[in-house]
């Protein structure tokens, strides 16, 4: 076990799991994000959820604020989220990091708020920015796998422009449920909970958890979305009269 010291406290790293590496690439045929693991290409969890979600709310929001403003907000939020994740990743690894850009100055206090409140119960961590996959089905990258209040946990960090309501984050729950299933299948673990840590630019912190029966229910809901995704892909191939490749069935 290695021990790191950062921001006034130590975080232990455990080598309990030997994680398989994967490469994230863009599939040129579909233009979607896929993971290349053990010579297989798997759709990402975010691609699956994005392709099967109800787009009506997004359409209404774009109509309200305008296409250009919607793109500006989306790009700014994405950049801020990327920077916040970098701060958190380096904190967990125990390595120094700073971002002196205006985006970085927004993201840094948000990351510190998550460190101060969200990561306080973390006793040890197994992996940061871990590529996980369920062979033949899907893959993705989770922000943190750790021991949180005595439970093996999948953690996802999220930035948000405003506080979240439970009913707005169903895809977040399905995301951590998908990662938990993949981790358990490949590594023989028993992930007990998923924790979503959210912070806004005005430093409002929220935490959402799924464990036990609730986590199982989110797993089932993700599997339904996975079925929908494959149905959509099959329909697209039939319409295009594309012959399915052998690897589609692996």
Language-model-detected regions and their locations in the chain:
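Metal-dependent nuclease catalytic cores that hydrolyze phosphodiester bonds in DNA/RNA
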Residues: 1-139, 246, 250
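Generic alpha-helical secondary structure signal
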Residues: 8, 21-23, 39, 95, ...
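A structural signal for alpha-helix termini and helix-coil/disorder junctions
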Residues: 90-94, 120, 185, 228, ...
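Mg2+/Mn2+-dependent nuclease catalytic core
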Residues: 126-232
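Charged phosphate-binding loop/patch that engages nucleotide di/tri-phosphates or the phosphate backbone
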Residues: 221-250
């Amino acid at each position: 076990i290695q021990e790191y010291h950062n921001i006034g406290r130590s975080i232990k790293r455990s080598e309990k799991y030997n994680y398989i590496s994967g490469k994230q690439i863009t599939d040129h045929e579909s233009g979607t994000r896929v993971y290349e693991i053990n010579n297989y290409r798997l759709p990402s969890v975010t691609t699956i959820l994005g392709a099967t979600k109800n787009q009506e709310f997004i359409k209404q929001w774009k109509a309200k604020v305008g296409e250009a403003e919607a793109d500006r907000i989306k790009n700014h939020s994405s950049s801020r989220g990327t920077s916040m994740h970098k701060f958190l990743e380096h904190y967990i690894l125990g390595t120094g990091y700073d971002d002196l850009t205006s985006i970085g100055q927004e993201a840094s206090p948000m990351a510190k708020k998550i460190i101060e409140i969200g990561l306080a119960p973390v006793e040890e961590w197994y992996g940061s920015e871990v590529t996980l996959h369920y062979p033949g089905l899907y893959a993705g990258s989770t922000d943190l796998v750790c021991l949180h209040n005595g439970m093996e946990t999948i953690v996802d960090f999220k930035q948000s422009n405003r506080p979240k309501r439970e009913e707005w984050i169903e895809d977040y729950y399905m995301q951590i449920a998908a990662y938990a299933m993949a981790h358990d299948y490949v590594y023989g673990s028993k992930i007990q909970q998923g924790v979503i840590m959210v912070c806004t630019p005005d430093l409002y912190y929220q935490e959402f958890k799924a464990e036990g029966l609730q986590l199982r229910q989110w797993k089932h809901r993700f599997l339904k979305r996975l079925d929908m995704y494959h149905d959509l892909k099959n329909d697209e191939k039939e319409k295009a009269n594309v012959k399915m490749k052998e690897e589609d069935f692996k």
